[in-house]
Amino acid sequence: KMQTMVKFGYHQTGGAGVTNNDTNLKNHNSFFADFKIGDEYLNLKDEKLSLKIDVEGHELNVLEGINKTLVNNKCILQIEIFEKNFQSVNNYLLSMNYKKIFEVKNRSNFFYKNL
């Protein structure tokens, strides 16, 4: 279930999040969405990829879902990482031989590569 906040009569495009089906938040618009595991659809090997990941706190789930893609290809990642998730996401990427190459200060955006 996806939820977005309504401000001034408009649905906000940033800050949407995934919640449990029974979560009911005031002032939010809700809709259901199907989520897929990336590696079940991405059949890529020995490619050069650039991926942007901005998933509002679900960074590790997404990375785990594209693990084969990340291992089998040369990638540059731009990933927004919530502060509370940074250590686990950073450790996960380092364990897969990714190196942090740049950070946008005060924006929680990090760039990694395995090239």
Q: What role is predicted for each listed range?
A:
Residues K1-L115:
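Phosphate/nucleotide-binding beta-alpha loop and adjacent structural elements of enzyme active sites
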